[in-house]
């Protein structure tokens, strides 16, 4: 999708549809001048409440404009930037259903809205563009018309151009914000594509290739450790999970370095289980197909590092992605096994379906010992218990640093990817004690997301600024889970928001 920011008069805009965004409070003051310009009755406003994402579509007979389709677009009260994202997503989705390729939006009111809500116009432009990317997303690359390159499916189209019209007084800020929104939006869509790929299309090697391709396109280094190197390093957690697989594991290291001095070194660790059957502790068959999404953390990390590079942030951002599938096999690890992780800590495998924490354990220790970063954040679709606690809209936040937790919470609000802090008290250590090893990888029925986080904490080697995000709920939504279905790319916007603040 091409993003065009312009100061041209509305009458000169050319597109398939022209949208006029309104806040709910504006309707009382509105003289219906917009509608009269298009020969549309002012009575049309009576049923338009300007709720976020609300659309009322008209067809103009005016000869003074080049666009016949006119839409009123609701922004809610205009105080929450996320309402702009939702509105834009709704507009893009509407355009997709109508097979429209060029969208124009008159954003002339954004200046007043920004002033009233004490927000930057650039921030509103950024979130609006992000929303358009989200609403235009459609995962159809495995349809026969897409797989067969010889077929020319002219019915399958997408939005090719988004034209945003701003007043000259805010143009520079809007242009910068829209450019950032394009980067964030496109990176999130890349993450969604990876999450939506089924297990027979995405193995550990494919995740490594996705990281390498991103590095090649955007100028950051990518190193991939193979199974032999993992064996030499004694990465017992990742290797144990991989025992039941016919596909070798990978450990991808993405390393973005800014041109000047880095203000900080940030390590992002993403769980990359390409398909999770549960292993010997087999999952129920119902819903197992969604376990292709168990590498959502890995996709998020690739997208965040790419965005950091494209934005030119003055941080060193290191992405670490342990990747494998988790399958039952005659050689698979078994409940009761004891493994030795990269850290030297021994683990009793209480349940082979608690595999994500085993591969993250090796990656977290590697991050601390090899790079000693200022901040470590890991993201993982780690526990169903977190879904029970927080549902599908919010991720669980665990951290050993109050300031870092506050920053992540604020970034969640700002980015529209909300998190809620969960306890990490030492009382929970008792639940993961083992009689035969240093620690057990499961803690029983209660507080499952907390005991998983307490397990991970043992592998950060004393690091003082670490956070764990359990994104099991919002990372993948089934058809009954909301308007967005499949992989959501949750965490990409949140991480980029954080990185931009630290840069």
UniProtKB/Swiss-Prot annotation:
SUPFAM superfamilies: Macro domain-like (SSF52949), Zn-dependent exopeptidases (SSF53187). Mn(2+) 2 binds at residues 271, 276, 294, 355. Keywords: Aminopeptidase, Cytoplasm, Hydrolase, Manganese, Metal-binding, Protease. This is Probable cytosol aminopeptidase. The keyword Manganese applies. Presumably involved in the processing and regular turnover of intracellular proteins. Catalyzes the removal of unsubstituted N-terminal amino acids from various peptides. Belongs to the peptidase M17 family. Its EC number is 3.4.11.1, 3.4.11.10. One of its GO terms (molecular function) is manganese ion binding. Binds 2 manganese ions per subunit. Its cofactor is Mn(2+). CDD domains: Peptidase_M17. It catalyses: Release of an N-terminal amino acid, Xaa-|-Yaa-, in which Xaa is preferably Leu, but may be other amino acids including Pro although not Arg or Lys, and Yaa may be Pro. Amino acid amides and methyl esters are also readily hydrolyzed, but rates on arylamides are exceedingly low; Release of an N-terminal amino acid, preferentially leucine, but not glutamic or aspartic acids. It comes from Chlorobium phaeobacteroides (strain DSM 266 / SMG 266 / 2430). GO terms for cellular component: cytoplasm. It comes from the Bacteria. Its main location: cytoplasm. The active site is at residues 283, 357. It is found in: Cytoplasm. GO terms for biological process: proteolysis. Mn(2+) 1 binds at residues 276, 353, 355.
